[in-house]
From Swiss-Prot:
It comes from Cereibacter sphaeroides (strain ATCC 17023 / DSM 158 / JCM 6121 / CCUG 31486 / LMG 2827 / NBRC 12203 / NCIMB 8253 / ATH 2.4.1.) (Rhodobacter sphaeroides). This is Large ribosomal subunit protein bL33. GO terms for biological process: translation. GO terms for molecular function: structural constituent of ribosome. InterPro entries: Ribosomal_bL33 (IPR001705), Ribosomal_bL33_CS (IPR018264), Ribosomal_bL33_sf (IPR038584), Ribosomal_zn-bd (IPR011332). Belongs to the bacterial ribosomal protein bL33 family.
Length: 55
């Protein structure tokens, strides 16, 4: 079986609230760490989320 191109990643909030999103990314085309601005429901505003490993 072939190796899958998409991998699951965890987007951790930089606000320090402990909130995270789980999403997928193409590991072949996006080789650098993903940084996205998304809504943090704990802080109730948009903050940056940085990519981390799923434990």
């Amino acid at each position: 079986m072939a190796k899958p191109t998409t991998i699951k990643i965890r987007l951790n909030s930089t606000a320090g609230t402990g909130h995270f999103y789980v999403t997928k990314k193409n590991a072949r085309t996006m080789t650098d760490k993903m940084v996205v601005r998304k809504y943090d429901p704990v802080k109730r505003e948009h903050v940056e989320y940085k990519e981390g490993k799923i434990k």
